[in-house]
Amino acid sequence: AGEDIGAPCRVAGIEMDLAVEHLRTMAVEVPQVEGKSPYGTVAAIFPYDAPAVMLARVGGAAILGGNRFRFSFSSQTPRTARLMAEVVAPFPEFEAVVGMDNHHFGEQCVRDPLVRVLFISGGGEVGAVYAREAHAFDKLFFAGPSGLPPVILFRDAPLKEAVPFVVRRAFLNGGQYCTTLKRAYIHRDIFAEARKLILAQMAEIRVGDPGDPLTWIGPIRVERTRALLDRALAALDGAKFLVPYRREGEWQGPFLVETPEPPDLELFGPFLALTPAASDGEAVTRVLQSRYPFLVSFFGAPPPGTKEKFQETFGMVYDNPDFLFTPLRLPFGGRGESGWILEQRDGQTVKRDGAFNYSAELVRN
């Protein structure tokens, strides 16, 4: 992962540990599939980030449900692809497709009547292309852009717990997960103290050799990610950069900015915007306007009815979270432009969105 995309070795190691532990404990999900039948072949095109986690989450659920699992890799991760193909080679239910362009792999899945379920990810244009082919599958899953996932620090937020989460979740793996934070709306009464603590916490966020266990941000080797960073930084208006950063080819960030209004764009990479909010209600209102309602986190007590509004609007809602890596058994998925499922029911294509459980989705009721 370090050689392919610049992922820090510590992060890649934790991903592997999470994946292995998830697969070892799949027995807890047996009730989700008991008495149900498999679809046949489940296929997936892995993104460049966290392929081991994808293999465990999607592949583990597919196999548990009695399906065959066929998967391909991002062109950005050739070394990872070869290694993972070797790992699954002894298990005939897993079929790793190495060296095939993802466009051709996707076309092959559309034409193959054995492939009943397909997982894809990418920008909205990718989702639109496959949506036109939804009739070829029983289910089509699309993980779209997560945009700039927000976190709110309400007026009574416990800063001792909130600040480490905000900083580490923003810059984990160089901000190259769809679940990494990009915007923090902070009540103005605690903004100065929160900013002070965030700046102190930033001392641990190092840019450097991915082989160094202290590195948080390795080289950003994916050109598209760097282009998204450039676009977001160019869109900033009235922003103040709070820490020194790098913009030298593959070496990027960390970009910690204070701004009255972060750009609402698709973004990957080491970026976090701090924005003061006049009240808890204002922070909620601004977050609810997100273009990509993928994930929202908050600390402190929200105004009455807020959590319900978040659950209606966003795919995932984290209430005073206490983890660094997202637990793999939490339901996963966005809403609106950030993700959907197209399913064939009684001859009709039905669209739905929101977080889902993989094992429950990969068997027929």
Kindly give the residue locations of the regions a language model identified:
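Short, surface-exposed amphipathic charged segments that create phosphate/polyanion-binding patches used
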Residues: 110-114, 155-159, 220, 255, ...
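Rossmann-like NAD(P) dinucleotide-binding subdomain of oxidoreductase/dehydrogenase enzymes
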Residues: 30-161, 277
